[in-house]
Amino acid sequence: MLGQMMTQPLLISSLIDHAARYHGQTEIVSVETDGTVTRTNWGEIAANARRMGSALTKLGLQPQDRIGTLAWNNRRHLEIYYAASGAGFVCHTINPRLFPEQLVYIINHAQDRVLFFDATFLPLVAAIRDQLTEVKHFVLMGPRNEDALQQIPGLEFYDELIETGDTDFEWPVFDENTASSLCYTSGTTGHPKGVLYSHRSTVLHSFASNTRDVIGYSAMDVVMPVVPMFHVNAWGSPYGCAMSGAQMVLPGPDLHGEALVNLIDTYGVTLAMGVPTIWQGLLAHAAKCGTKLESLERTVIGGAACPPSMIATFREKYGVDTVHAWGMSEMSPLGTANIPLAKHRKLPIEEQHKLRENQGRPPFGVELKIVDDDGNDLPHDGVTQGDLMVRGHWVLDSYFQLKDQELLQDGWFATGDVATLDPDGYMTIRDRSKDIIKSGGEWISSVELENIAVAHPKLATAAVIGVPHPKWDERPLLVAVKAEGEDPSEAELLEFFDGKIAKWQVPDKVVFVDALPLNATGKVLKRKLRDEFKDALTG
């Protein structure tokens, strides 16, 4: 016997319709590529998305055709999010900071039919357009620009294309398992791989994100996603904010500390989201200019392990709660979020603070386990380390156009992380499988060493890598960036590890660099560091 309840498909178009209907006047602030600020609202975003959805349909596209974007966090990009998916196409957000050869591969592999791009990327698109064999429409995200038209003959313009759309366009209704959006992971070996999300997985992910024990967007919030919209759908924030009716501040291309501090203080941002490297710049500028960040209530930090010193600075200096989270493209990306349990209120304050340093617990919809090298389940005791496995409602089962390749292990996806799980489900990432340092048969966590190093007041940032050693196979090397105006010695930095870890885990050497190589989302490119310093202990 079946239940007698209504059945309605979980579609992304329903999110923007909800935002328009019940939060239509809620403001969206957008920093454009030229630095100007546009103030709009959910009602206008929804109306424009509907018109653009109609305009795309009139181009003669087929259902499920891919719509590519090379764009920053701005209002037009937000409109495309809903226009493409809502009209039955697939919104393919592309990382513009990849090498041109990688971009050509990704756009052709995805078979994008339309490519929207911000003015910032006009020279890039002009240089590779002849290699983009599947793209039929190149669209500059802005008004008509004659100079751009000279560079790309036949170029179309967002502000003109949207005028061809109907204001009364009706969103099509289809199976909720229909593909909605596409992101490519930057593979460490071989070509990047596509992760194809569905309407169902995206809406369920939004429900989970909106719970109080995860991110908990609210109509009372002013949300600034600093994580790019080309990176795993900006962690789902455009969908979660529409579902909750939160205000949004879209920061555009300038993600330096000064620009972000100004946006927080000017528009009363209450919740901001980004990777640790972004917050390092923000905290440095906040300290320099003396702001109190009075409106900011919480930050969500993911993408890489968050140093405990950063959590402490946010808490102690600015009264900001930090939600340490973890996920990956293959998980839409939400996997865990660190929110304390009721029983933790009774813990001494120092233990409460220590608890907030791990990556947190999974929400309903995600399951975690750890296994040994033979695939055997390991205990959730908070001590035993193993390979982290996941499954859930918004976890992939195969990569785009690679459905025939066996990916899952007994229904579980191998994340490539080494982790521990405690009895309450709190997960701690010990390292990436490829980054953990194997020295004399023992494992050394590069993350643990980095957390200690970046707490040194004379360092701006640091990374730890394993490099070849003639006796121990591998040993840790500290790659450090000095703080402005500081000149720490190698001995001074190595002494900083005393009493914090076992002596045999202390890095063998320190090398100083002007900056760490980062990818587009702020993650350190450790493979590049390993290549550069592979002879540091043997040469």
From Swiss-Prot:
Thermal response of activity: Optimum temperature is 40 degrees Celsius.
Record-level Gene Ontology MF annotations: ATP binding; ligase activity; metal ion binding
Regulation: ADP acts as a competitive inhibitor and inhibits the ligase activity.
Enzyme class: ligase
Impact reported for K523E: Retains 1.4% of wild-type activity
Chain sites annotated for binding Mg(2+): T185, E330
Catalytic function, reaction form: 3-(methylsulfanyl)propanoate + ATP + CoA = 3-(methylsulfanyl)propanoyl-CoA + AMP + diphosphate
Gene3D superfamilies per record: 3.30.300.30, N-terminal domain of ligase-like (3.40.50.12780)
Keyword Cell cycle: no
UniProt effect for mutating G303P: Almost completely abolishes the activity
GO BP terms: fatty acid metabolic process
Phenotypic consequence of P333A: Retains 69% of wild-type activity
Chain's role: Involved in the assimilation of dimethylsulphoniopropionate (DMSP), an important compound in the fixation of carbon in marine phytoplankton. Catalyzes the ATP-dependent ligation of methylmercaptopropionate (MMPA) and CoA to yield methylmercaptopropionate-CoA (MMPA-CoA).
Protein name: 3-methylmercaptopropionyl-CoA ligase
Organism (species): Ruegeria lacuscaerulensis (strain DSM 11314 / KCTC 2953 / ITI-1157) (Silicibacter lacuscaerulensis)
